[in-house]
């Protein structure tokens, strides 16, 4: 992957792959798949600044599994792979 470092309070997330088949074995076409709302954090920015200019570090870290909104962030393609760049505030929480 191309080296990418998010700025500010942004994070780079790789979506988990959507299911290809139902439990009954029916193949789901790409047009009918729901966008997964779960992914793995690939890279994190340094954090946001408060009004006094102090750096507030991000709570999520590289490797965390996170849940986020279906329409969160901006989809980008780096080295032929699909990722999402979003603000940390778009993340609902981490998955243990």
UniProtKB/Swiss-Prot annotation:
Localization per record: Cytoplasm
CC annotations in GO: cytoplasm
UniProt KW keywords: Chaperone, Cytoplasm
Molecular function (Gene Ontology), one example: protein-folding chaperone binding
The keyword Chaperone is annotated on this UniProt entry: yes
Superkingdom field: Bacteria
Transmembrane segments: none
Record Pfam families: Cpn10 (PF00166)
GO process terms (BP): chaperone cofactor-dependent protein refolding
Primary subcellular site in the record, as a coarse category: cytoplasm
CDD domains in UniProt: cpn10
Family: Belongs to the GroES chaperonin family.
Quaternary structure and partners: Heptamer of 7 subunits arranged in a ring. Interacts with the chaperonin GroEL.
General function of this protein: Together with the chaperonin GroEL, plays an essential role in assisting protein folding. The GroEL-GroES system forms a nano-cage that allows encapsulation of the non-native substrate proteins and provides a physical environment optimized to promote and accelerate protein folding. GroES binds to the apical surface of the GroEL ring, thereby capping the opening of the GroEL channel.
UniProt-recorded name of the protein: Co-chaperonin GroES
């Amino acid at each position: 992957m191309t080296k990418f470092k998010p700025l500010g309070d942004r994070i780079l997330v790789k979506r988990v792959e959507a299911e290809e088949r139902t439990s009954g074995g029916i193949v789901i076409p790409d047009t009918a798949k729901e966008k997964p709302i779960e992914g793995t954090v690939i890279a994190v920015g340094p954090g946001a600044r408060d009004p006094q200019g102090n750096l507030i570090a991000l709570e999520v870290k590289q490797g965390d599994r996170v849940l986020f909104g279906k329409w969160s962030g901006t989809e980008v393609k780096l080295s032929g792979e699909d990722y999402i760049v979003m603000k940390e505030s778009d993340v609902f929480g981490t998955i243990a």
